[in-house]
Design a protein with these regions (language model features):
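N-terminal leader/targeting segments and the immediate start of mature chains
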Residues: 3, 24, 33-86, 118-126, ...
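Non-transmembrane domains of secretory- and envelope-associated proteins
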Residues: 41-50, 146-149, 158-159, 172-174, ...
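Flexible, processing/modification-adjacent segments and terminal tails
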Residues: 43-55, 105-177
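Short beta-strand segments that buttress and anchor functional surface loops
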Residues: 61-66, 87-92, 163-172, 196-202, ...
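An acidic-aromatic
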Residues: 75-140, 197-210
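A short, surface-exposed beta-strand/turn
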Residues: 99-108, 176-197, 548-563
Length: 572
């Protein structure tokens, strides 16, 4: 069956090359591939009438999305046909292309065309399909804001153009949130979007709280509709075998009911919005987020009333759905053989372990980073343990490239932003001569990209890696002591994990076995707090999560499976 359900005009299929003219070899899809974390497969929808200043229901625009907190500058290009129920957005000059078809029955269809690098080093394209559901339909995705509530506040010269400046300003106590749009053109004539800046949670893209800026160019209301919405020829698309909510990111859902207005609940939600700078674009999204917040807040309050050894707190994730939280976890399962070396058990005989250890105090750990909307936790755990090993060898802390692993390690079973494994990343590093520094390869993009490892200078070479024996905390402590930070995996699916704040985390609902692990983190130490032994974990969900990005995880009962799949590298 053809992958795309919508009709195409004869002779209007798109050529198999990206916007830079690079050609791609086409491979048949893998018979089995992992579940996707598809935040980019479904989009925020905007109503056709963007009053008081309408951009029209059909438009094409390109630009750059800047996320200062994630250190990302991401070029994009978008084609939107609201009335036709279809949109296409491509990132990094066509490296990744997403399509949304909201009119495809019954609940819309989304596609993601992404680059992949084969074992032979060839750049190929893969296509993945996600069907919308009644609960999570696929919507048209807009890259322009809904301007309801904006007012003209002045005029500025920006980017060589005279612009009208529109703002929607909200005061939150001592803080204020300002949403600003620069439009070129007269007040009564055609307007061209130039820049949209917002501080807070982005209702357009659904990522972490931050300051976002979209700079637009080449806005037009005319483009070849059918051609631009045709999937590339000769790239078969495969659906997800077992669709889960994480594959249908909750973006502007249709709600079947309207909650009653409760003054106390409204006040709690407003305080959350004040604290985290939230701004919602329309009444439907506001209600949706308020409900998410209330359900999560009730869970947090109930947990804290039980006086457990760790506390939860509302954070930047409190208005998220379970599906959106699941998208932050990117560990895959694999049937590939693990080539790790056996652990040197003889070293356990007469080892004298310190009572506590924290590699941060010795300068072996880079700052906490934000994986953004990419399921790349495995790459952060991999680079973290390599950075520590390199520090122990040379005395220098060199940030290594997660992006290189995301772009290049497909041939060993990793799937870029849709998940991977640390030991498969080790196999790729060892087989390809090493791993580059972040400075040499280029900045982290939070998106799949085309591999260009041959143009980078390698910063570390790998002789092998060691699998730490599972369920053996003494062996894990020894590995941490002698080899630096260790890559570990945990079950991060309990809701309490998302809202951890402080104390020693112990969650009976956490899985303990290998098959229950779903998130990779970096083990940087261990210790004792009020009689409770803990592991010190570094996460990649930004410093806004946990205790400045870190967690104290109980050693008791191998909670969350931290000792089930630990590895460390051996450098050349």
């Amino acid at each position: 069956m053809p992958c795309l359900q919508t009709q195409r005009e004869p002779g209007l299929s798109r050529p198999l090359e990206d916007s830079l003219g690079r050609s791609w070899k086409v491979l048949a899809p893998r018979p089995n591939f992992p579940q996707l974390s598809l935040l980019s497969l479904a989009g925020w929808s905007s109503p056709p009438d963007l009053t008081p200043h309408s951009f029209g229901s059909i438009y094409h625009v390109s630009g750059v999305l800047s996320l200062p907190y994630a250190e990302v500058r991401e070029p994009f290009e978008a084609w939107v046909d609201v009335a036709g129920g279809r949109s296409r957005i491509q990132y990094y000059h066509g490296q990744v292309v997403t399509y949304q078809f909201s009119h495809d029955r019954p609940f819309g269809v989304g596609y993601k065309v992404t680059p992949e690098t084969t074992a032979a080093g060839e750049n190929v394209r893969r296509c993945f399909r996600v069907n919308g559901t009644k609960a999570h339909p696929i919507r048209v995705q807009s890259v322009l804001p809904n301007l309801e509530g904006f007012q003209v506040v002045g005029h500025e010269h920006l980017g060589g153009q005279d612009c009208s400046v529109l703002q929607n300003e909200t005061h939150w106590g001592l803080r204020r949130n300002v949403y600003t749009l620069w439009l070129a053109g007269g007040l009564h004539g055609p307007r061209l979007p130039v820049r949209y800046a917002v501080r807070g949670f982005s209702r357009l893209l659904g990522s972490h709280y931050d300051k976002y800026q979209l700079d637009y160019r080449n806005f037009s209301r005319h483009y070849p509709l059918d051609d631009v919405f045709s999937l590339p020829d000769r790239v078969p698309c495969r659906g997800v075998p077992s669709p889960e909510v994480k594959h249908h990111m909750q973006v502007n859902p249709m709600w079947d009911f309207v909650a009653r207005e409760e003054d106390r609940a409204h006040g709690l939600f407003e305080r959350f919005r004040h604290r985290h700078g939230r701004h919602y674009g329309d009444a439907a999204e506001l209600e949706h987020r308020r409900r998410n917040f209330l359900h999560n807040l009730r869970f947090i309050d109930s947990h804290n009333r039980a006086n457990r050894p760790f506390r939860l707190a509302p954070n930047h994730l409190t208005d998220r759905t379970p599906g959106e939280l699941a998208a932050l976890r990117g560990r895959l399962r694999s049937s590939r053989p693990n080539h790790g070396r056996p652990f040197p058990h003889e070293q356990l005989a007469d080892v004298a372990l310190p009572e506590s250890l924290d590699w941060r105090l010795y300068g072996a750990v880079t700052p906490v980073k934000d994986q953004a909307v990419c399921g790349s936790c495995w790459s952060f755990a991999t680079t973290g343990t390599l950075e520590g090993a390199l520090f122990l060898k040379t005395g220098e802390l060199v940030p290594l490239s997660q992006q290189m692993l995301i772009d290049c390690s497909w041939d060993v079973g990793n799937f870029g932003c849709d998940g991977g494994l640390e030991w498969q990343a080790y196999d790729w590093i060892q087989g390809h001569g090493g791993l580059a520094s972040a400075d040499s390869y280029g900045p982290y993009e939070g998106q799949n990209g085309v591999c260009h490892s041959n143009a980078s200078t390698l910063a570390v070479r790998l002789a092998g890696y060691v699998n730490v024996p599972p369920a053996n905390p003494t062996a894990l402590k020894l590995a941490l002591l002698r080899h630096g930070p260790v890559a570990v995996n945990v079950d991060a699916s309990p809701r309490s994990f998302a809202f951890y704040a402080n104390g020693v985390y112990y969650e009976p609902q956490c899985g303990h076995n290998l098959e229950q692990l779903n998130h990779a983190v970096l083990l940087v130490g261990y210790g004792l707090l009020q009689g409770q032994a803990f592991w010190l974990l570094k996460n990649s969900w930004s410093p806004l999560w946990g205790n400045s990005g870190y967690m104290l995880l109980a050693m008791k009962d191998n909670d969350c499976g931290v000792t089930a799949a630990a590895t460390y590298p051996i450098l050349e």
